[in-house]
Amino acid sequence: MDIILKLSDELDVAKWQVEAAVNLIDEGNTIPFISRYRKEATGSLNDEQLRKLFERLTYLRNLEEKKAQVINSIAEQGKLTDELRAEIEAAETQVAVDDLYRPYRPKRKTRASVAKEKGLEPLANIILLQQETEDIKVIAKQYIDAEKGVKTAKEAVQGALDIIAEVISDNAQYRKDIRDLTFRLGKITSVAKKPEEKTVYDNYYSYEEDIVKIAGHRILAVNRGEAEKILTVKVVAPEDLILGYLERHIIVGQNSNTEPFVRLAIQDSYARLIAPSIETEVRNMLTEKAEDGAISVFGKNLVQLLMQPPIANKVVLGWDPAFRTGCKLAVVDGTGKVLDTTVIYPTAPTTPQKIAQAKTTLVKLITKYKVEIISLGNGTASRESEQIIVELLKETGLPVQYIIVNEAGASVYSASKLATEEFPNFDVGQRSAASIARRLQDPLAELVKIDPKSIGVGQYQHDMNQKKLGQTLEGVVEDCVNKVGVDLNTASAPLLTYISGINGSIAKNIVAYREKHGKFTEREQLLNVDKLGAKAYEQCAGFLRISDGTNPLDATSVHPESYDATLAFMKKQGIKPSSIGKLAGLSKIIKNYPKLASELGIGELTLRDIVAELEKPARDPRDEMPKPILRSDVLEMKDLKEGMILKGTVRNVIDFGVFVDIGVHQDGLVHISQLNSKKFVKHPLEVVKVGDIVDVKVMSVDLDKKRISLTMKI
């Protein structure tokens, strides 16, 4: 298989682009580095394209390795033919290779292998050849052998049929066609083990759907119901069609001596060998496809969460709500430094005195540190805490706003080794409150400290392939961190770990170097960091910024390898280093990019990136994202009325709809059918993404079930 050509066709990009990208990956370059600094080589392939390419490249290389192993194994058995080799080499999936290898794979003891040991293979061949005119039962008597365990002609025939059944089951073409028939015409069914018990799987108690139509989230739902022993799930294949297909391909002519036996072997082969394994394969393939879709959605949601615009340079009070153990508070300054922590008890079990004390404490903190925003976690006791905040603001008139932030993962972080190292003198509640405050100030810098799987913007994330989920989300975080870039002198080790070319060990060494030698004043000093060699420097330098260093270019995304060309360009244009960042409109006055790039010895795309950086150094792509909604009053779920139009924030996007925070502590659902009135929506991500500010209308409110139905068809 020509892997380069295959990838070119699959990804719909030119062969030379794929070739260049593969070479760059094989040379040890990271995806963010290739995407940002090797645009000429790859024809501007972006992060998403490069990650898909890398994923498929890995799969296809593993496939080629597997083919080689299979060919060697069959050759060692002396059974490899030119035709079989060609079929294996042409296979495009691991399933296809498995089908071809099945007859030659070393098997555990089976009914067929036992029959072969009893010397019944010649009888099986006679029946399968379907040319015998003599009664098979008479011929079978010749194979009676008490020593081998064949006591009767009936046992001999049964053993022969077991061999034929396995031969049929091992036929690669039959398996492929039966699998295809099952996919095209089969159904998934589920029934409740205990129909009288009410569960969240009510919709699947008597459920049936065509395999070709079933949505990924329903596959994951029935899988979970099955895992929890609530549902029995089956694949119902078009059995009559499949048996008819096998009979047409296996039965030759109309030999009344052999045909009944061949039919029996076909039926047994399908029922005992083919159907169970095809059902498993179909379920696995459906699950894999559903998981891939869910992981993709999770990744897209995570991008939006990580890329939320920071609310920088604001003093924030982080509030981790709770009942019995009290609400933990942490005040952080505009740089994220913790100024103060405390615990208040305004929520149940409480007293008027404790509520008054809590409000007094809040007023003192707000006035002492000039708190501008309260960042309230959305966990247990959040509703009650919000009520206290609103009462306080109304009573005092303090110029403070509040926002409810998703605290998912805060408790995981607060109990982690990393949090202990960062806040050795704080308890888990204080750490959690500080994290809730900081994730408002700079969501990206704070959320990278948490396992992406714990952030909670997806569906069924705990049920799927954790390795694949982890790899995808790590890639998402890496892409986001490198798109934004980091300040070399303030970035934490967890944040630095996601920078291109830097691993956990090097990240810690950078922080240690900074603590020992003081601030970095130029990028080249990175080469003095332990274990950070020339290759790592090449990969990371452009993503690390020094805002007040000796070289103004170190504050930009211009890579050090392009400094000479950049300085030559600046000289040609009469630009002084002090003018960097004050060159609005520079890109418009350059008349001939190709000619100028050629003169400078760089590519045109690189030159355009350099010009953009000189105009606006280290631009933050998060600035273009919707700003979070700050509130000063509370709305209760009971206040909602049908027809009300509200502004909300998209919290989560899943296959069947969108969850929107409208400020009532219970996210409302906009079903996929309610997203757009002008066109059919195949997936919600076509319309909205996490973090979007949207206008919604209340369709219905169920206070008992705590369900809010919303529509965007306004």
Tell where the protein language model's regions lie, with residue ranges.
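Single-stranded RNA-binding regions, centering on S1/OB-family and related RNA-binding modules
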Residues: 546-714
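Structured, non-catalytic alpha/beta "coupling" segments that mediate domain-domain communication
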Residues: 73, 87, 98-100, 225-240, ...
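A glycine-rich phosphate-binding loop feature that marks nucleotide/adenosyl-phosphate handling sites
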Residues: 180-188, 319-323, 379-384, 405-412, ...
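Duplex nucleic acid-engaging cores and interfaces of nucleic-acid transaction enzymes
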Residues: 49-52, 59, 63-318, 322-425, ...
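Short, ordered loop/turn segments at secondary-structure junctions
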Residues: 37-39, 128, 238, 321, ...
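Generic start-of-chain signal for non-secretory N-termini
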Residues: 1-19, 26
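Long, highly charged, low-complexity intrinsically disordered interaction regions
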Residues: 55, 61-79, 89, 421-519, ...
